[in-house]
Amino acid sequence: MSRTRRFVTLLARLRELHPELADPLPEIRRGHVLLSGIPVTNPAALVPRDGSVALRVQEPLRGERKLQAVLTRFGVGVDGIVAVDVGAAAGGFTFALLHAGAARVYAVDAGHGQLRGSLRQDPRVVVLERTNISALTTALVPESVDLITVDLSYLSVAEAAPQLNRLDIRASARLVALIKPMFELGLPGLPADDRLADAIDHAVRGVVDAGWRDPEWMRSPIAGGRGATEFLLHARRG
């Protein structure tokens, strides 16, 4: 038997094993593909046709657990909706939305290259990288939006909320925003516990002024960076 029949490229083998992946290359290059338990990042590497090739099981993203908690707490239905995830980063919120049944998620982030490869390849995800919240319009999101999630650094929820009004937001839409007290209050470091209520009040006022109603909040089940206390704010549009 010839060598070419016994060996195939890693890329070809992964396509055979996982035809659901539209583009396996990002998974390979990020070290998510294992050959006999060892990460291989060269898509042209020759592997035995009967070799053990597997996708690495990825740890849940922190944002995933945060969003799951608030969706459950406030009874936010996601099945079949169109959502915009502002500050998508690695995609914790985006993943949670898809897992809950969202039909489409616009994953918006000012940076680039952070979103997990599996999410990039998902046909339900529209990736809008290098896109600041101030640039969001119906030209970028040409659909009516049912849910907006916000997880931003260096910008308060109060400042972010009015910038969302350039989108076509349904009257039945919901908003979920992660309140980071340090950024909400414009502080150089983590605020004292007695300032946390001020941060929540600031975010709530900004959201209400931007046209949302019935704001309610909960403490995030997971701390932020450096152990920072964070809160999840939920509000309705109509």
Which residues make up each language-model segment?
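S-adenosyl-L-methionine
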Residues: 106-159
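Conserved beta-strand signature within the Rossmann-like core of class I S-adenosyl-L-methionine
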Residues: 171-186
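Core SAM-dependent methyltransferase catalytic element
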Residues: 222-238
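Conserved S-adenosyl-L-methionine
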Residues: 212-222
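Conserved SAM-binding loop of SAM-dependent methyltransferases across substrates and taxa
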Residues: 90-101
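A basic, amphipathic helix-loop patch mediating RNA/tRNA/ribosome contacts
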Residues: 1-49, 82
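Conserved alpha-helix/loop element of class I SAM-dependent methyltransferases that forms part
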Residues: 62-81
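Conserved class I S-adenosyl-L-methionine
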Residues: 79-89
